[in-house]
């Protein structure tokens, strides 16, 4: 993605450091650089910096194609995209500065903790070299520090946060037009590195993605126009249908910054005003619902900025005492779509086959993972990260924490969706299940979401043998209810004991990720996702040998579920049997649970007395995290292909345990005053 260019003026060139802002329209960093003179467009691929959040296969496919279109657009304007492969982004920036004689660097803000620390380091290092560094907001309607309550404190509830955003005294900035022309800087001495985003074994699977998706900023703009002029009108009506193709499909475009959220907001508000003038109540309702999903995306960045550990630990301190079930067989059955609950299984098979899930199905499978199987929420979040086309750290963390109950405004922990009821709610005719579970395609609609209750004659007529060609339920809901009840009792006992120990002075609190140091909350230990087998992408292989994680910590944190129609409770045990295939798993061996460490401490964050209004539970997943589903055919579910290094760093109790993540976040707290950072010019 390199080419010959003209040169730099006496004032030097300006480097535009592209990251997740892969567009030429409404790109403040690019616009500022164009105004300053000759421009060098740069993308640095440094996945090692991301640790275990290296993009998965489908995300890398998207990134590859998005960069290609960005380079094409830049060439049409007069320059090109320089790509660098590195293990250190800041070092690469310095190299490009030296080889091009650039005097300024422009980039747009990111809000995840690793990026915050990296960007601060970049500003320090480059400024020390005499390079002017400027950064801009290109990803949010308002910067996180702009949205506060009357006392200047960050909000702890989404409803209050979004209400404040909509009532700000000034509107979000209007989107910028793309530049008409770019004067290119001299890159004759700056050799571009070829970037490899896929290997030969992945190309076959990736080729299928191109049939349904078109990455790139211009394609994202077309998708936005199509949505606003079509499906938006009935968004509120159709978005809850699991088999619906009427949602926006904008989430991957938003994640990679191909579409400006400001442009989305402004165009949707124009529609809102027009429909209000026409008295179109259905249209107004759809606009409000869609804007709320945009608000949830904003909130995910807001939470990540104000609580940089939110992708790794719960924000409600007592939930760290919940005894998570450490069961790799359950995890494997969930990934394979072999839980015995059709809606859950259909969703997991679609996820692997397409890299996509409707947000309602994301809620269902996540809820089942956490509440019925009671597996550690970070396992599920990491699997989503590896397999989703629109994997987004901030949005995924918000979604899993909300569903799991670890956000202050989550639903109660003892409530969960009944997959059978949810099936008839979101897939009333069973079309979605039949598409992704062909073994159930002949089952009548009356039984499609609970085949275990179907008469034997009906099963025989449909060619179904439960426990053979389709599994019985992996665990009964009554049993799950009892287990959850026991686990919650144990959690509260441990929390009370820890509080008593702290009050007696025999246990010392640890610092919280929040800025309120007087409300300590212990940093959780991580789950190690071991690469026990080499990556395989052969679709003909069975899915029994998918990779599974192992636990390294002595304490796994708990979470609550999102929306629910059933109270499920959990029992304590010692180990779980293999995934059942021939019988309902009602009397399995005791499940293994992580033992809570005696020295763990908890402290509730004072501001987090949270509740979310009932209707928000229907739409708790941000549009950036999910927005719809396209029609695709089902198929064999192959092995889990991990995105990159699956090593979760093992950490000691508290902050500063020696892991990469911990040291990054320590640095974040030591150096971060982002208000000052963002204004450094």
Swiss-Prot record:
Binding positions for FAD per the UniProt entry: 235, 247-251, 293, 359, 390-392
SUPFAM superfamilies reported for this sequence: Cryptochrome/photolyase FAD-binding domain, Cryptochrome/photolyase, N-terminal domain
Regulation of its function: Light exposure induces a conformational change in the C-terminal domain CCT1 required for activity.
Site (Involved in electron transfer from the protein surface to the FAD cofactor): 324, 377, 400
Matching PROSITE patterns: DNA_PHOTOLYASES_1_1 (PS00394), DNA_PHOTOLYASES_1_2 (PS00691), PHR_CRY_ALPHA_BETA (PS51645)
InterPro entries from the UniProt entry: Crypto/Photolyase_FAD-like_sf, Crypto/Photolyase_N_sf, Cryptochr/Photolyase_FAD-bd, Cryptochrome/DNA_photolyase_1, Cryptochrome_C, Cryptochrome_pln, DNA_photolyase_1_CS_C, DNA_photolyase_N
Tissue expression as described in the entry: Widely expressed. Expressed in the aerial tissues (e.g. cotyledons and leaf primordia), but not detected in the roots.
Effect noted on mutating residue 21 to N: In cry1-401; genomes uncoupled mutant (gun) with defects in plastid-to-nucleus signaling
Annotated knockout phenotype: Prevents the shortening of period at 27 degrees Celsius, resulting in a long period phenotype. The double mutant cry1 cry2 is impaired in blue light signaling, resulting in long-period, lower-amplitude oscillations at 12 and 17 degrees Celsius and completely abolishing rhythms at 27 degrees Celsius. Plants show reduced root and hypocotyl elongation in an anion channels activation-dependent manner at the plasma membrane, as well a reduced anthocyanin accumulation in blue light. Impaired blue/UV-A wavelengths-mediated inhibition of shoot regeneration.
Region named CNT1, binds chromophores to sense blue light and mediate CRY dimerization: 1-489
Coiled coil: none
Record-listed ATP binding positions: 239, 359-360, 409
Polar residues: compositionally biased ranges: 583-598
UniProt: Mg(2+) 1 binding residues: 238, 246, 358
Effect on the protein upon substituting residue 283 to E: In hy4-5; reduced anthocyanin accumulation and abnormal hypocotyl elongation in blue light
Phosphothreonine found at: 621
Induction notes from the record: Expression levels display circadian oscillations under constant conditions, with a high amplitude and an early phase, with maximal expression around 4-6 hours of the light phase. Induced by light. Transcripts levels oscillate weakly and proportionally to temperature, but protein levels are stable, with higher levels at low temperature (12 degrees Celsius). Accumulates in response to low blue light (LBL).
Quaternary structure, from the entry: Homodimer. Interacts with ADO1, COP1 and PHYA. Interacts specifically with the dark/far-red (Pr) state of PHYB, but not with the red light-activated (Pfr). Interacts with PIF4 and PIF5 in the nucleus in response to low blue light (LBL). Binds to SPA1 and SPA4 in response to blue light, this interaction prevents SPA1/COP1 complex formation and thus avoid COP1-dependent degradation of the transcription factor HY5 by the proteasome and promotes hypocotyl elongation. Interacts with TCP2. Binding to ATP mediates conformational changes which facilitate flavin binding.
Protein's recorded name: Cryptochrome-1
Organism of provenance: Arabidopsis thaliana (Mouse-ear cress)
């Amino acid at each position: 993605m390199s080419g010959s260019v003209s040169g730099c003026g006496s004032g030097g060139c300006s480097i535009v450091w592209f990251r997740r802002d892969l567009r030429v329209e409404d790109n403040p960093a690019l616009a500022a650089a164009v105004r300053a003179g000759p421009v060098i467009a740069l993308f640095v691929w440094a996945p090692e910096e991301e640790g275990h959040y290296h993009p998965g296969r489908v995300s890398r496919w998207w990134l590859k194609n998005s960069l290609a279109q960005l380079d094409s657009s830049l060439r049409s304007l007069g320059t090109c995209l320089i790509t660098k492969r590195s293990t250190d982004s800041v070092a690469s920036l310095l190299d490009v500065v030296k080889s091009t004689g650039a005097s300024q660097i422009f980039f747009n803000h990111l809000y995840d903790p690793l990026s915050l620390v990296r960007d601060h380091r970049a500003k320090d290092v480059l400024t020390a070299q005499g390079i002017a560094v400027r950064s801009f907001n290109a990803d949010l309607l308002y910067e996180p520090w702009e949205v506060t309550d009357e006392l200047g404190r960050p909000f702890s509830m989404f409803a209050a946060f979004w209400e404040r955003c909509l009532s700000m005294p000034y509107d979000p900035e209007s989107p910028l037009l793309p530049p008409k022309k770019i004067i290119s800087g001299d890159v004759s001495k700056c050799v571009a590195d070829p970037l490899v985003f896929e290997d030969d074994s992945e190309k076959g699977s990736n080729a299928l993605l191109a049939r349904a998706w078109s990455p790139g900023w211009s394609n994202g703009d077309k998708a936005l126009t199509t949505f606003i002029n079509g499906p938006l009108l009935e968004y509120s009506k159709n978005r809850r249908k699991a088999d619906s193709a009427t949602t926006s499909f904008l989430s991957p475009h938003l994640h990679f910054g191909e579409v400006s959220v400001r442009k989305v907001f402004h165009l949707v508000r124009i529609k809102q005003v027009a429909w209000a003038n026409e008295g179109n109540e259905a249209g107004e309702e759809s606009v409000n619902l869609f804007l709320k999903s945009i608000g949830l995306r904003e909130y995910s960045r807001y939470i990540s900025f104000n609580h940089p550990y939110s992708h790794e630990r719960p924000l409600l301190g007592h939930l760290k005492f919940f005894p998570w079930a450490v069961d790799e067989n359950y995890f494997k059955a969930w990934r394979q779509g072999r839980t015995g609950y059709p809606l859950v299984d259909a969703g997991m098979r679609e996820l692997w086959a397409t890299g996509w899930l409707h947000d309602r199905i994301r809620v269902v499978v996540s809820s089942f993972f956490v509440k019925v199987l009671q597996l550690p929420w970070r396992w599920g979040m990491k699997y989503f990260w590896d397999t989703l086309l629109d994997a987004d750290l901030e949005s995924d963390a918000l979604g899993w924490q909300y569903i799991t109950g670890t956000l202050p405004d989550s639903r109660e922990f003892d409530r969960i969706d009944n997959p059978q009821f949810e099936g008839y709610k979101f897939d009333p005719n069973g079309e979605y299940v039949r598409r992704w579970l062909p073994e159930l395609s002949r089952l009548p609609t009356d039984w499609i979401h609970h085949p275990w209750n179907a008469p034997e004659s009906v099963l025989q007529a449909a060619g179904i043998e439960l426990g053979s060609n389709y599994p019985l339920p992996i665990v009964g809901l009554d049993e799950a209810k009892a287990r959850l009840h026991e686990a919650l009792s144990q959690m509260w006992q441990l929390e009370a004991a820890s509080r008593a120990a702290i009050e007696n002075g025999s246990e010392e609190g640890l610092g919280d990720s929040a800025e309120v140091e007087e409300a300590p909350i212990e940093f959780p230990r991580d789950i190690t996702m071991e690469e026990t087998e080499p990556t395989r992408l052969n679709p003909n292989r069975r899915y029994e040998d998918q990779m599974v994680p192992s636990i390294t910590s002595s304490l796994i944190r708990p979470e609550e579920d999102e929306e629910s129609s059933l109270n499920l409770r959990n029992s304590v045990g010692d180990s779980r049997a293999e995934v059942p295939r021939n019988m309902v798993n009602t009397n399995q061996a005791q499940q293994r649970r992580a033992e809570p460490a005696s020295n763990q401490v908890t402290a509730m964050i004072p501001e987090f007395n949270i509740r979310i209004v009932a209707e928000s539970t229907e739409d708790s997943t941000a549009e950036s995290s999910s927005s719809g589903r396209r029609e695709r055919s089902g198929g064999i579910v192959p092995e889990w292909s991990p995105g990159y290094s699956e090593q979760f760093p093992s950490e000691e109790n508290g902050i500063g345990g020696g892991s990469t993540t911990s040291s990054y976040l320590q640095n974040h707290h030591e150096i971060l005053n982002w208000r000052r950072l963002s204004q450094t010019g």
